[in-house]
Amino acid sequence: MYATPIGYADTRFETAADAPRQGVETPYAANVQVYESFRGGLVGLEPDDRVVVVWWADDADRDVLAVRDGDRGVFTTRSPARPNPVCITPCELLAVDAADGTLAIRGVDMAHGSPVLDLKPALD
């Protein structure tokens, strides 16, 4: 398997422990910085769109299979602590600057520097 980050999260949360459990639980705005080689993919994104940020929880514990003292398996949760910490966060798109690759978003739950793997339109 091979995946290349398209950018990274620029947030106020220095660690995963600082971030909210779910993006919908926070009003905080943040940025996604898209690397130059991927900025052509931003064409057509508009403020007020809803996007799903697909990101990698690079500081997550990858040895976890059960949560809450073992009463539930990790695959029944949205926890980033899991064998493959791929995370999805629906966000409100506040602004797009395709020239410098900056997306301003609201509803973030990722730590600063988290690799962003993809952006997808959110479905209602």
Swiss-Prot record:
Q: Does the keyword S-adenosyl-L-methionine apply?
A: yes
What is the superkingdom listed in this entry's lineage? Archaea
Which family is annotated? Belongs to the tRNA methyltransferase O family.
Q: Where is the TsaA-like domain?
A: 3-124
Give the binding site residues for S-adenosyl-L-methionine. Answer: 20-22, 58-59, 78, 111-114
**Per UniProt, which keywords does this protein have?**
S-adenosyl-L-methionine
Protein known as? Probable S-adenosyl-L-methionine-binding protein VNG_1115H
InterPro entries assigned: TrmO-like_N, UPF0066_cons_site, YaeB-like, YaeB-like_sf, YaeB_N_sf
Q: From the UniProt record, list the coiled-coil ranges.
A: none
Tell me the organism.
Halobacterium salinarum (strain ATCC 700922 / JCM 11081 / NRC-1)
